[in-house]
Every structure is written in C-alpha cells, then in structure tokens.
C-alpha cells in the first residue's frame, strides 16, 4: 500500500494563507485569530452530522482489500473520459466516506485503527494526485469536493497529526471551486453546494475570515431573484434553476438541494455569531409556506417541479425532513411550519388557489385534491432534458393539467406513457420523434401571452399556444370544487396528422363509468367507448362534456399498468377548432352522476375572449386576449380595454374585480380599464394581480 505521503499533484494552495489572484475576491492576507470557541462548536456539529452510517465490519474489510498499492479501488473504473463518467469515479469518494465513518465511530471494531487510517490516507492521496476532471464541469466543481468533504472533516484531526501535507492538499482540493470567481458566483442550488465544502474547509482550518465570507455568500443566496433569468427563489416564491432559455420551475430537485444547503448552514451556526440575518430567516420561512407547501400533495412533488428528473423517485420523505429541520431550529414561524408538516403527513389540508405569475403556473387545491396548470411563454420553459434524462419532455410546458386525488395518478405510468398526450395539452399527434429540450432549449412558449390571476380561493389562467404549426387559445377556470377548461382558435397547418387535446391520461384504477345525454350511466366495456357520452367518472374524478363535443375514452398499456386516456380529436388541418369540458375532483360516483342542474355557464369561447360564470355565486372569470366584452348575469356587460385576466364577483354597487396582465415583465401598459354595468375604473397591473371596487 502506498504511503500517505506519496508525491501529490500540484494544486493551487487555498488554505489558511490563501492569496487571491488579480481580480479575485479571495483572501489576500493571513486569517485573523479565530473565535476558537464558536469554530470548535461548529466543527463538533459537523463531525457529529457526518458520522451516522457506519458500514458493517465485513464491508470495511472488503473495501480495504480493494485498495491497491497506488490508493485506487479495484471496483472503480477511472479510465473513462466520457461525459458524466465522473459518476463512476465518485464511487471512490463514497467508499472513502464509509471507511472514514468506521474509523471515527467510537466502540466500533475499526475505531482509530491505524491500518484503516493508512488505507484511507493512501486513497485520499491517490484522489488528489490524479485530480480527476469530467466533461461535465459539475463533477469537479461540485460533485467531487462535496463527496470528499465527509472524509476530510471526519479525519481532519488525525490528518493534522499524521499527514500535514496530505491534510493541506485535501483542504486545498475543497477550496479550489471557491478560488474560481465564476464558480464562486454560482446561484441557487449550485451556489449553496459550493458553499458547503468551502465552509467545511474554513471550519477545520479555523479560518474565520473565510468562514464569514462563506456565510455572507449564503446570506446573499437567500434572496428574491431580481433579474429575468436569475436563479433561486422567485418573487412569487417559486424556485427556478437552469434559466438559460427561460425561467424553469425546479423546486423538486435543485430546490431541494438549495434548501438542504441553507439548512446545513443554519444548523451548524445556530447560536453563534455566524447565524444568518433575521430577515433572511424570515424570507426562507416564507419560501416554505408559500412555495414548498403548495407544490406537495400526498407524499409527492408536482411533476412540473421536477425538471428533467420526472422519472426519478419524487416521493417526498426528504421534504418532510427538510421542513422538520427548519421547524426544529425554533424560527419565528415555527407554528406555521408545523402546520405544513401536518399537511405533508396527511393530517391537515392546504386549500386555496395560487398563481405563480413568474413561472406561468397555477396551483388549485380544493378539498381533497390538487390540480395544476403549467403554461409557457417567451419568458418560461417546460421541463428540460439533459444528462440522458427528460428526453421526452418537449410538451411538458404546453398546458400540462394534472389532477390528483389519491396522489398516485401519474407516477406509476410515466415510464411508458404517451408523451404526446400529457394531460391538458393540445398538440399534433404524429409519429415523429420529439426534439429533446436540452437544458431548456426549445422549451419556451411561442407567445408573450401567458399567466393568470387568483383571489386566493379561485383563479383563472391561460395562454396562447403556438408550436409545431399549431395555434390554440387555452384557459382554465378554477372554482371552489370544479374547474372548466376552454380551448378556442385551434388552427393547424398540418394536414398529415391530427391535433388532439388530452383531457387526462391517468393510471386506470377501478371502473370507468359513462353517462349519455339522458343521464343513464354504465361501465366502460373493452378498450374504449363506442357511443357518445356527456359525463365520465373514474377514480373519484368526474368529467362533464358539452353536447356534441365527441370526447373519446380509451384504455391501453403503459408497461404493466393500464392507462385511461380521455381526449378530443380535432382532425387534420383544422381551422377554428374548440373544446369545452369541466372536471370535478374528489367526487364519488353517486354524487357526481346525481348532480343536477348547471354549475357554470360558458359566456364566451372565442380567440378574442374566454369567460365562465359560476351559477351558484355569480363569480365570473375571463381571459381577454384583446380588448372586449362579455355579458354576465348580475353584472351586465363586463369589458376590458386591454388584454388581461379578470375575476369579477358581487353585484350592484359592490363588485370587486381582480386583474392581472398576461405579459409579465414584458408588459407595456400600466393599467387596464374595466367596465361593469356601465361603471368604469382603471385597475393597475401589478405582479401577482391587483383588485379594485366598482
């Protein structure tokens, strides 16, 4: 076995006497005398945090046997230089972390075993000597040092004692990313990741100056994004990452890493002079309450929030644990966070409606369900592809409309479902291979018009779809316990393949019941309907269709699972196509088919305006694609002089209107004039919507 003091490759020195390059913000003088008491407290916390997970003695013995005389592991392939081959090389660092835990766990067979130490030191020396790179920059800048951090922190005291040179080179390795101004400037999850191992190096070297620089950077990362493409927490408390081609929802993966990174620092520095600023803690809590909580339902993150990782395990114990960690810190809104935890565990419901205007994304949470609408504009993109994942994500931002009651409606069938039939979308269904939206490229919408408005309980959203020789005006009207979906101006230039609107493509779970215009209900037999139907019920979701609209219901396989697909076929080369349907989440079969009378009226469904009124409350919602007017019971003529989203409720002299513009930061108008029953008022356009009384 090679000695730990083997000749090591030269790396830039970024230890306790780091000197910055010209133009760098690095450390230019020896660090001042550290606050040793606090530093040691943080160091003990880190050590304790990294220690759990000691492997069995048999695993330790086997790993020691696999270390060659040069310090490499026989089960790791170090030779590949292909893109993402770093994933294989990271096994070296994972093995080291296992051995380090065995070495540092009191009472274990290998606790402070010198042979084990020598084996670890040899493998560490091998790693820093070779200083592996990868065509994917992430591995050397983030992945490798993040993995290596565990071993270096656990063994740092003994390395200082036995191998000072190895110790120095290991800490230099951890500090390399911080030395590169471009990498130190990373935002979002990548930014917190780089701070993690830089922080670890600062703590074990007792470099208080560097430690405060890292904490300052973390404070700067807990902020509301300002620029159009800035990553991280957005002004509406959504989370975005990989925004090169447009803002991209990414709470489920990168957001999770970002949250873990911020909590990492909050936990380690709690009660010390290094704590995050109070206003940063308050913002972070608000992000949990207004962002994280709304994207979660029945132990799973919304698919829209998972980026290219749609097919990964997106179930959510990790998010429960993250929220519990924040609440455990005793922050000012601990009680509200405990309410989120109760919701995540299924002991409480989160109800209401929220429009994430920054991301063209609406969440509706009626009693017993969660429904979402994901649109895109020239400002936003759908789920990306990259690193071999998400290759079928082309249509994920084209009106995806997922409805969940039980929580498992989609995940079991994703691997084999039809990606040209994403629920809510209107697309050309052909046999051509879809382009992969690599890192978001090609995933943006074809129009500036997209968005919505919410009053906190109800909401309306919509967009102009323009892609692949197909255009459509699409909107969703969310009322308390149902929603209406409208499509108009469906114009296709493709004569070789039909345009289709998918109402839902969902896991088949039990019987599918159909009712004709007379109201007589029967179970679907075979693989699809053979006669018209006006209502359909399945798995506690009801669907209602307009007379003569001719929806189709079919059952097919996705792997070993059966799938129910409900859709409209608009035909080839269609001009002026449209659709209307309503969806009732969380309703039993008997209650749905026993529902009599009309719940809503479609006031308009044209390329100029789409509007729906709830019969019970009189609440009226509209999408004006241009200046226009609709007639609504109790309100008379309801008009707007500019494109907008609008909610109107009340009657007589007490009508409240809530509006939002459809152009986000690209808007050129500051207000819209709304007229109700002959009375007009100018309502300002504000991000997130604004209200006025008429």
Question: Can you annotate each of these PLM segments?
Answer:
Residues 1-17:
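N-terminal export signals
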Residues 14-40:
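C-terminal segment of N-terminal export signals and the immediately downstream linker at the start
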Residues 35, 233-234, 514-520, 682-687:
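A generic structural motif
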Residues 358, 577-582, 683-694:
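C-terminal beta-strand-rich structural cap/linker in extracellular carbohydrate-active enzymes
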Residues 631, 635-638, 663-693:
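C-terminal accessory/interaction regions of large nucleic acid-associated machines
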């Amino acid at each position: 076995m090679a000695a730990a003091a083997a000749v090591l490759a030269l790396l830039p020195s970024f230890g306790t006497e780091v000197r910055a390059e010209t133009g760098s913000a690095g450390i230019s003088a020896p660090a001042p005398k550290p606050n040793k008491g606090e530093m040691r407290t943080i160091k003990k916390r880190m050590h304790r945090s990294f220690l759990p997970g000691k492997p069995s003695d048999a695993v330790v013995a086997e790993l020691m046997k696999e270390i060659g005389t040069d310090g490499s592991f026989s089960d790791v392939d170090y030779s590949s230089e292909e893109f993402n081959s770093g994933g294989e090389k990271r096994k070296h660092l994972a093995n080291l972390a296992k051995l380090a835990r065995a070495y540092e766990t009191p009472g274990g067979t290998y606790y402070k075993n010198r042979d084990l130490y020598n084996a670890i030191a040899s493998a560490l020396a091998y790693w820093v000597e070779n200083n592996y790179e990868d065509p994917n920059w992430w591995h050397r800048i983030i992945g490798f040092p993040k993995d290596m951090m565990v071993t270096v922190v656990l063994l740092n005291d003994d390395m200082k004692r036995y191998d000072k040179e190895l110790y120095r080179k290991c800490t230099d390795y951890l500090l390399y990313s911080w030395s590169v101004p471009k990498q130190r400037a990373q935002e979002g999850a990548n930014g917190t990741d780089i701070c993690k191992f830089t922080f670890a190096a600062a703590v074990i070297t007792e470099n208080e100056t560097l430690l405060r620089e890292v904490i300052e950077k973390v404070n700067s990362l807990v902020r509301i994004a300002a620029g159009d493409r800035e990553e991280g927490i957005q002004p509406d408390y959504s989370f975005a990452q990989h925004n090169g081609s447009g803002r991209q929802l990414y709470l489920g993966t990168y957001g999770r890493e970002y949250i873990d990174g911020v909590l990492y620092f909050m936990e380690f520095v709690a009660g010390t002079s290094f704590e995050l600023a109070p206003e940063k803690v308050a913002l972070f809590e608000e992000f949990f309450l207004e962002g994280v909580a709304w994207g979660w339902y029945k132990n799973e993150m919304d698919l829209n929030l998972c980026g290219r990782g749609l097919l990964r395990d997106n179930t959510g114990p990790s998010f429960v644990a993250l929220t519990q960690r924040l609440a455990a810190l005793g922050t000012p809104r601990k009680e509200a966070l405990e309410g989120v935890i109760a919701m995540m565990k299924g002991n409480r419901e989160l109800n209401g409606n929220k429009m994430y205007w920054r991301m063209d994304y609406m969440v509706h949470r009626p009693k017993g369900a969660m429904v979402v609408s994901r649109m895109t504009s020239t400002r936003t993109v759908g789920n990306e592809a990259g690193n071999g994942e998400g290759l079928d994500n082309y249509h994920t931002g084209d009106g995806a409309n997922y409805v969940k009651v039980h929580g498992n409606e989609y995940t079991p069938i994703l691997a084999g479902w039809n990606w040209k039939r994403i629920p809510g979308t209107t697309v050309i269904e052909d046999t051509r291979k879809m382009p992969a939206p690599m890192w978001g490229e090609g995933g943006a919408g074809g129009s500036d018009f997209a968005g919505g408005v919410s009053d906190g309980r109800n909401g309306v959203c919509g967009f102009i779809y323009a892609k692949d020789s197909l255009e459509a005006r699409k909107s969703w009207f969310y009322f308390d316990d149902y929603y209406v979906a409208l499509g108009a101006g469906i114009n296709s230039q493709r004569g070789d393949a039909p345009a289709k609107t998918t109402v839902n493509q969902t896991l088949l779970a039990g019987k599918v019941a159909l009712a004709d215009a007379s109201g007589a209900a029967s179970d679907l037999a075979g693989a699809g309907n053979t006669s018209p139907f006006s209502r359909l019920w399945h798995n506690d979701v009801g669907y209602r269709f307009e007379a003569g609209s001719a929806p189709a219901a079919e059952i097919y396989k996705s792997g070993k699972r059966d799938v129910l697909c409900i859709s409209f076929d608009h035909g080839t080369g269609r001009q002026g196509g449209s659709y209307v349907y309503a969806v009732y989440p969380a309703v039993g079969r008997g209650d749905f088919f026993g529902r009599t009378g009309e719940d809503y009226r479609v006031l308009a469904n044209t390329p100029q305006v789409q509007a729906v009124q709830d019969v019970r409350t009189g609440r009226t919602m509209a999408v004006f694609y241009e200046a226009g007017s609709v007639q609504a019971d109790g309100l008379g003529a309801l008009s707007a002089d500019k494109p907008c989203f609008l909610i109107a409720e009340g009657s007589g002299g007490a009508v409240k209107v809530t509006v939002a513009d459809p152009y986000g930061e690209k808007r050129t108008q500051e207000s819209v004039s709304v007229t109700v029953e002959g009375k007009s008022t100018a309502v300002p356009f504000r991000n997130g919507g604004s209200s006025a009384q008429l």
